[in-house]
Amino acid sequence: MNFHRTLPICVLTLFVVLLTGCLFRSHEERRPFSTAPLREAASDQLIDFINTNAARLQSFKADVDYNVTVSKQKRGKTNEFEVREYTEISGYLLVRKPEMLRMIGLVPGVRSTLFDMAGNSRGFSLSMPTQSKFIVGSNEILKPSIQPLENLRPPAIFDALLLKEIDPQTETAVLEQSTEMVKDPKNHKDLQQQDYEIIVLRTEGNRSYLSRRIMFSRVNLLPDRQLIYNLQGQVITDASYENFKDYSGIFFPETVHINRPVEGYSIQLTFTKLTFNQPLKDDQFVLNQPPGYKIINLDQKNGNSAVVNGQTAEEASRPTH
């Protein structure tokens, strides 16, 4: 046998075997399933929970602790991000349907105002006393800012906090049985657990699109996650809910984590005190420009026009007397 002639053939044969995977065994890593007892429910029962709870909850005011995380892409780096976390911010939150929100954060320790944001269906205003800035803008973002928190809008908070009713005139809801990842209460390792998912399809004109996906835990039949989509099918809000409590027939979570993957920020709200359905006046959602503050109109940067407190952003930017 000519050793030098057969060696390349052997090497080639081994190479082909390696490429075809004959010498390797691949397997999927399957996480164990939770052994928690699971409850059964039909789609009508889950949809009724969403609609009934939404109808009962018309407004609330709350003491809240904020935890804000910002993820910003490093300059010149496509896969590297700078992450900043702002913790220990307490404050207040006022919410009134259909789309009124007031969000106040306090300076840790001092408890003076760190930020104050008011918004409705037409636009928002944001006061930042520590920087003497007053920011106004519309709710629509035509050109995202490279500063993630400049993309924060009240509807992102409002829609995540309150599970909207499923409108039978414009929406269709279907049930899917799926699985979710949960933590083992003993060792905190990831486990798979069966869940229910209500998929909401919305119709506008001749077009239907995926609007929301609401996940229910089968341990307690309460929602623990909601995905909200845009018209392009992107997830724009990923909200998770923990520790629901019953407030005289209104179910509301103790902690809400709101992730906005497109804009690159997330906000966790932990509620320490909640009061539901007490009257909240219109002026509680009005935020006027303080004298001497520099006004920043985000819509002049983005090219669209805002309406804030019944005024356009241009009108709101005029000096107050």
For every predicted segment, state its role:
Residues 23-25, 175-292, 296-300:
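Gly/Pro-enriched, hydrophobic low-complexity segments
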Residues 51-60, 84-87, 94-99, 117, ...:
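Edge/loop elements at the starts and ends of beta-strands within beta-rich repeat scaffolds
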Residues 1-22:
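Sec-dependent bacterial lipoprotein signal peptides
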Residues 44, 128-212:
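Flexible, processing/modification-adjacent segments and terminal tails
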Residues 24, 96-159, 293:
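An acidic-aromatic
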Residues 22-88, 151, 302-321:
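N-terminal leader/targeting segments and the immediate start of mature chains
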Residues 70-108, 112-116:
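Long, hydrophobic/aromatic-enriched structural stretches that serve as scaffold segments
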Residues 63-72, 106, 199-203, 228-229:
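Generic short beta-strand segments
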